[in-house]
Amino acid sequence: MPEVKVPELAESITEGTIAEWLKNVGDSVEKGEAILELETDKVNVEVVSEEAGVLSEQLASEGDTVEVGQAIAIIGEGSGNASKENSNDNTPQQNEETNNKKEETTNNSVDKAEVNQANDDNQQRINATPSARRYARENGVNLAEVSPKTNDVVRKEDIDKKQQAPASTQTTQQAPAKEEKKYNQYPTKPVIREKMSRRKKTAAKKLLEVSNNTAMLTTFNEVDMTNVMELRKRKKEQFMKDHDGTKLGFMSFFTKASVAALKKYPEVNAEIDGDDMITKQYYDIGVAVSTDDGLLVPFVRDCDKKNFAEIEAEIANLAVKAREKKLGLDDMVNGSFTITNGGIFGSMMSTPIINGNQAAILGMHSIITRPIAIDQDTIENRPMMYIALSYDHRIIDGKEAVGFLKTIKELIENPEDLLLES
């Protein structure tokens, strides 16, 4: 019988976690229909069946880690049940038998309540993130009783809020879980223990790999933002009119400045592959986006060929896709350089960590008005920004790193030169 295997996703992705089965055993499956959702360190993807038939067997469970090419389901012949939801509604006897079997193994009323809640979850599709579904199962929470805070999507923080509500039933349900947890080193201190999401675990692993496998250094400079702020103030209204409402932000200036600096210092646009150094001849710039699930870095492709409006529009589009969990793998791989802006959170200075398979990352920070010596006799208040370049010293020498950052500074302080470059 045909097998469904974990598909090739991207060169850097070798495994994933089954977030949710969209089909039950016995359900009918159409060719090209999604049967499960797979969580990777970058995005969630739906795995589809290449054959029509019936889902005969699930070879892995929700929460299991599976590798690319691994068989995860078997598709048999027949018509099967209409859908996951209908299969539960149309077979009440099977549900009752399942409940009876589970009740035979325990007389605990809490376990019985959790079984009933699990059946309720199957009968009604709740709009929730995969991590929230898994978190709810682990903590015996009925998603139907959780009120989402934003966008009608249940998230982990909504479940936490539900659990913290003063209800005696919740206290009863949570008691056994607390007895099983082994964190009694400080029994008088309140703590919370929870499993890390796959994306969080992968990010932690990769950050540690970067720290261990690169000779990372950071160099700093400061930028006088006066001219670029004045130019933006003069042009922003006309810019929006000319480009269908696209706003002129600072990211397009720093992106175009980065492209110019990368052309001047090509080793910053490189990476090490074994004993070889690969210098990239393209300029796909990653823009870090903060989401509820952590930091994501989608890439704006071919920034050397795009104007300010195209870059701003694409950054805005990628940010929306990231927050709505609609990024594809094509948005997340094969970049050449990354820009991160800690200033939106109020950061004055930081040492950003290099993104995988890259040689450097540019860090932007808060714009702070402070006194600056213009010359020996003049001090003025100027809007200043600290910028940082973290780089792999195996590829980039200190002289080139300082020169790269100085080029960024000069172009931002003289934005007309950037317009001429474009």
From Swiss-Prot:
Per the record, what are the reactions this protein catalyses? N(6)-[(R)-dihydrolipoyl]-L-lysyl-[protein] + succinyl-CoA = N(6)-[(R)-S(8)-succinyldihydrolipoyl]-L-lysyl-[protein] + CoA
Give the record's pathway. Answer: Amino-acid degradation; L-lysine degradation via saccharopine pathway; glutaryl-CoA from L-lysine: step 6/6
Signal peptide residues are none
Please give a single GO biological process term from the UniProt record: tricarboxylic acid cycle
Q: Bias regions of kind Basic and acidic residues — which residues?
A: 152-163
**SUPFAM superfamilies per the UniProt record, alphabetical:** CoA-dependent acyltransferases (SSF52777), Single hybrid motif (SSF51230)
Ranges where the record places region Disordered: 77-184
Keywords carried by this UniProt record? Acyltransferase, Lipoyl, Transferase, Tricarboxylic acid cycle
Where in this chain does the record put each Peripheral subunit-binding (PSBD) domain?
Answer: 127-163
Residue spans with biased composition (Polar residues)?
80-94, 116-130
For this protein, the record's Pfam families field holds: 2-oxoacid_dh, Biotin_lipoyl, E3_binding
* Enzyme class label: transferase
Note accompanying the cofactor annotation: Binds 1 lipoyl cofactor covalently.
The Enzyme Commission number assigned here is 2.3.1.61
Mention one GO molecular function.
Answer: dihydrolipoyllysine-residue succinyltransferase activity
Matching PROSITE patterns: BIOTINYL_LIPOYL (PS50968), LIPOYL (PS00189), PSBD (PS51826)
Give all residue intervals belonging to the Lipoyl-binding domain. 1-76
Question: Where are the N6-lipoyllysine modifications?
Answer: K42
Query: Composition bias, kind Low complexity: at what positions?
Result: 164-176
Gene Ontology CC annotations of this record: cytosol; oxoglutarate dehydrogenase complex
Superkingdom, taxonomy of origin: Bacteria
Q: Which cofactor does it need?
A: (R)-lipoate
The record's comment on protein family reads:
Belongs to the 2-oxoacid dehydrogenase family.
Assembly and interactions? Answer: Forms a 24-polypeptide structural core with octahedral symmetry. Part of the 2-oxoglutarate dehydrogenase (OGDH) complex composed of E1 (2-oxoglutarate dehydrogenase), E2 (dihydrolipoamide succinyltransferase) and E3 (dihydrolipoamide dehydrogenase); the complex contains multiple copies of the three enzymatic components (E1, E2 and E3).
Question: What biological function has been recorded for the protein in this entry?
Answer: E2 component of the 2-oxoglutarate dehydrogenase (OGDH) complex which catalyzes the second step in the conversion of 2-oxoglutarate to succinyl-CoA and CO(2).
- Its name, as the record gives it, is Dihydrolipoyllysine-residue succinyltransferase component of 2-oxoglutarate dehydrogenase complex
What gene does this protein come from?
odhB
